[in-house]
């Protein structure tokens, strides 16, 4: 089975046009977090408003944003997945009509109860924990920890620190979904 690939952090329209033409990419991620160097600008949003994604699914990434901001910015995309990267509760995530992914940052273990709390998520994205940084660390965690949740009925999405040297191992661990960054 071929893994599904998400490229995240797209904020350049020319890069977006190139990525859409690539066959092996399934999801395109757009960050709506002002502290990120890959934050989407209002100008970019205007460009993407009528853009044809050619079968690729947009993923709008948020960190503790309010509902109005999420509804407004995600409306620029057709049927986006919402990816929650902050301290959003399961009730908050479930309050949207969109499919969503919840990010859980992993330090030394996976809290199975926390995974179960987000049972309505269409995917759980596991990423390395780094103090005061909600994501985009570029570092991996001990992927063997994923074994503690493999028997749960969830879509496992692996993110952080995936590169040419470890991509085969990443595929073996997560089976189906990988998230890769754009270049900064």
Language model: regions and residue ranges:
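Conserved N-terminal beta1-alpha1 strand-loop-helix module at the mouth
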Residues: 1-150, 154-158, 162-175
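Intrinsically disordered, low-complexity Ser/Thr/Pro-rich tracts
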Residues: 8, 183-184
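Conserved small/polar residues in nucleotide/adenosyl-binding loops
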Residues: 176-182
């Amino acid at each position: 089975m071929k893994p599904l690939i998400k490229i995240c952090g797209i904020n350049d329209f020319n890069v977006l046009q190139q990525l859409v033409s690539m066959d092996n990419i399934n999801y395109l991620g757009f960050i709506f977090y002002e502290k990120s160097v890959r934050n989407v600008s209002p100008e970019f949003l205007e460009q993407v408003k009528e853009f044809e994604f050619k079968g690729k699914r947009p993923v709008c990434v948020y960190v503790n944003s309010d509902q109005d901001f999420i509804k407004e910015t995600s409306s620029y995309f057709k049927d986006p997945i919402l990816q929650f990267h902050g301290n959003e509760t399961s009730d908050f995530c479930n309050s949207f009509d969109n499919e969503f992914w919840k990010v859980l940052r992993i330090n030394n273990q996976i809290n199975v109860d926390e995974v179960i709390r987000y049972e309505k998520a269409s995917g759980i994205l596991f990423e390395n924990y780094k103090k005061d940084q909600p994501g985009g660390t570029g570092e991996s965690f001990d992927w063997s920890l994923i074994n503690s949740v493999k028997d749960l009925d969830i879509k496992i999405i692996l993110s952080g620190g995936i590169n040419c040297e470890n991509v085969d191992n990443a595929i073996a661990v997560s089976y189906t979904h990988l998230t890769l960054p754009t270049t900064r």
